[in-house]
Design a protein with these regions (language model features):
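N-terminal small-domain helix-loop-helix segment of the aminotransferase-like
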Residues: 1-44, 51, 228, 235-238, ...
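Alpha-helix termini
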Residues: 29-31, 136-147, 200-206, 332-333
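Conserved PLP-anchoring active-site segment centered on the Schiff-base-forming lysine
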Residues: 55-77, 90
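A short helix-loop-beta submotif of the ANL/AMP-binding
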Residues: 79-85
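Active-site phosphate-binding strand-loop segment of PLP-dependent enzymes
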Residues: 91-162
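PLP-dependent enzyme catalytic core of the Aspartate aminotransferase-like
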Residues: 102, 237, 283-296, 300-333
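Conserved core segment of the aminotransferase class I/II
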Residues: 175-246, 250-253, 323, 329
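Conserved glycine-rich beta-strand-loop-beta hairpin in the small C-terminal domain of fold type I
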Residues: 226-233, 245-257, 263-275, 305
Length: 333
């Protein structure tokens, strides 16, 4: 390619060839009907979220998400001038707590923000969960006389374990904006490349995409890197060998259960979210750190009393950690 095509400025919406290939890849995999006009190239899923949040809201609007949730949602929504409401977790399943959602939905809610497969729990929202969420949002949109958008944050979409029910969320609700990153699927997190996909039948779909370059100007994100846009155009639809994550999950989950930890089995990602062995998960994680276990307290994910394990490491390191988890559990007996 001409060096200018690789290193020059790209069009504001992203390189057309890349957008076309992404749309075609989604349609082939999920039976959808995206066109290039429905795709906006972004600086990773975070960049896609920054655009999605601003494209379908006004400052002061309310966004609802579900615990446990990615800790960065708080600054992301605050930066857009939005109120973030976090629905308490159903700690037995980590599926959506619908009873709590129904009490919080009101006419000021512009969008629901979900993350499946989920960071930090590793849980994948089931088809039943997504169908129920779609039904509720459809009914409430009619009641409030405005669309309630569903912003689906999906950087872990391709890390799904064998036999897990993993619906493509946009196929169940037209007013869906999907935020995707290639960082996990092809193991390129430092390249910060992703996209926003707006369902073709989404309310004001054309306007949502059209406003994105203007949003880029206001937040200083002036286009995803041209070189990486060209790169992902040739690999969309492919993934790295992600099997190590499922291997690590099986080893870790079975061992923790044997040692007495309570944990909902992950359906994807490379995270696990067990209950802490004491109510204060921050204190528990400090004790773990003294044994060289680096864990993250659940408090920052809106779910105290739990902790996150990341097992995106060589399997030998997971196996090396097992005796330490066992010893830690024994100290609480």
């Amino acid at each position: 390619l001409d060096p200018l095509a690789l290193h020059g400025y790209s069009p504001s919406f992203g390189i057309m060839e890349t957008r076309e290939k992404i749309a075609a890849s989604l349609n082939k995999k999920y039976g959808s009907d995206y066109k290039a006009a429905n795709i906006f190239m972004a600086i990773g899923a975070a960049g896609a979220l920054a655009h999605a949040l601003r494209a379908v809201t006004n400052p002061g609007d309310e966004i609802i998400t579900f615990a446990p949730c990615f800790s960065e949602y708080k600054p992301y929504t605050a930066g857009a001038g939005l109120k973030l409401t976090i629905i308490p977790a159903d700690i037995d399943t980590f599926q959506i707590n619908f009873e709590a959602l129904k009490t919080q939905l009101n006419e000021n809610v512009s969008a629901i923000l979900i993350n499946s497969p989920n960071n930090p729990s590793g849980i994948v929202y089931s088809t039943e969960t997504i169908e129920k969420l779609s039904s509720i949002l459809t009914a409430k949109s009619k009641e409030f006389h405005h669309p309630i958008y569903l912003i689906s944050d999906e950087p872990y979409r391709d890390i799904i374990f064998e036999g897990v029910d993993a619906p493509y969320i946009a196929n169940y609700y037209n007013n869906t904006l999907t935020c995707y990153s290639f960082s996990k699927s092809i193991s390129l997190p430092g390249e910060r490349i992703g996209y926003l996909a707006v369902h073709p039948d989404c309310s004001d779909a054309d306007k949502i995409i059209e406003i994105c370059p203007q949003i880029s100007r206001t937040i200083g994100q002036n286009g995803a890197a041209s070189l990486m846009q060209r790169t992902v155009a040739d690999v969309c639809g492919y993934t790295s060998d992600l099997s190590v994550y499922e291997t690590n999950k099986k080893i870790l989950f079975e061992a923790l259960r044997e040692y007495g930890y309570h944990c909902v089995e992950p359906g994807g990602t490379f995270y696990m979210f067990p209950r802490s062995l004491e109510p204060d998960s921050q204190a528990f994680c400090k004790k773990a750190m003294e044994k060289d276990l680096m864990l993250v307290p659940g408090d920052i994910f809106g779910c105290p009393g739990h902790f996150r394990i990341a097992y995106c490491v060589p399997t030998q390191r997971v196996e090396k950690a097992l005796p330490v988890f066992k010893k830690l559990a024994e100290e609480y007996r």
